[in-house]
Amino acid sequence: MGTSYEPRRADYLDEMATRHETARVFDVCMSCQKCLNTCSVFPLLVTSIDNCVDRDAALLTPTQQDDIVQLCHQCTQCVSHCPHVDAPAGEAVNFPALVVRHRAMLRKNSFLTLRQQTTEDVLARSATHMSWSQPFRFFGAQLLRYVTDHAPALLLRLHSVQKQDSSRRALTGEVYEVSYFPTCVIDAYAPEVGVATQQVFARVGAQCVRGKEHNCCGAPDLYNGNIKRFRRIVARNVRAFRASIEHGRPIVVGQPGCLHVMREHYATFSDDPSVVDVIAHLQDPWQFLAQVETPAGNTAFQRQPHNSSLVLLQSSTASRRDDTQLRDVLEKCGWDVQVIPHGSVAETVWGLGKERTDEVSGLITEVSGLLEGIGGTEIVSESCLTNLLLTGQLHRQVRHPLEVLAQP
């Protein structure tokens, strides 16, 4: 990731050093502009620097810098476009990592207003609030309405979704255990996806085991600059994952955005000497299913004859992995798959803050436009939050691929 984004550096949270690095990266982006059409961050960056003398990013005011940084919602599209990611140390650019450092600096040096800090903290804890039982869940819902304009879509199904028994006994004779990390997003907003995952795994002889400490990957705290809390979550999760490895259990992470955070940031922010080995053991559901006996030979996975095709929405976050495995699993199960790539809409509820409403709404509209002309074909996406937002926009259900595989 580069020494400039190494949190153990003494000047990592220093305002002058951080703003100097932000200006350097902005200058590189201004001269490059290959990411101009990826999201609204870069048009604002270019417009702001255009108004500076000699187009010098160092002349941006702190407020202008902060406004550009706060607009980023970690979709990671810029990383795949950037020709400077692999440049030598001191010249490399990693915009998402810069945003993490800049936001951490703002929080550490008390540049956030009380309203901003409260809003960020509520968003970071929203999944926890929505996991509460009534009547406390009602209080969590009111907090969510206060901090995001997308609350109606997120809360739409909460009254109809009941706590479901997610324990499923394996349906085959040979049984082995898998450590399943559903993530707080699935727990709070899409528990049916967790149930579907365990139903599908049961069909290949895998019994899902969930540790008591498995809840959140820490992404909301990382993205809002709460590095201290993020480190605690990383330490707890790495400890739990290491125990699973010692018991010989594969580790499956339910959401692509959470898996991305673990692979990209855990080694950087963890002091555990085993963290690199732990990260190497993390899998998404498709890596796991691809490794077991092919499900194509199991009639429980076969498609329904009346609906043989589906559209797979693939976010920019998910596409940074081996993006062929999900498609391969679906095709082995008999589906004809059409992949439509798109910019990541929201991997955590934190990304739905009011200051990012226009950006997220624009992405939802863009993805909806890509789906024009899609008739009765099943539409699936790995991102549970994206599914909720698109379901409200399209007035048709967008499901998780595992829900499709789990259907009888």
Task: State what each model feature region is.
Residues 9, 18-19, 52, 62, ...:
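General secondary-structure edge motif
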Residues 19, 93-408:
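Iron-sulfur cluster-binding electron-transfer modules in prokaryotic oxidoreductases
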Residues 22-42, 66-88, 92, 188, ...:
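Cysteine-centered iron-sulfur cluster-binding motifs in ferredoxin-type domains/subunits
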Residues 4, 31-37, 137-138, 207-208:
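Short low-complexity stretches enriched in small and charged residues
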Residues 9-30, 60:
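Asp/Glu-centered strand-loop micro-motifs enriched in Gly/Pro and often flanked by an aromatic residue
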Residues 32-35, 45, 162-167:
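Short acidic/polar alpha-helix capping motifs at helix-coil junctions
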Residues 6-14, 50, 76, 172-175, ...:
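Active-site-adjacent bridging/hinge elements
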Residues 1-14, 37-71, 85-114, 399-404:
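Non-heme iron-sulfur electron-transfer modules
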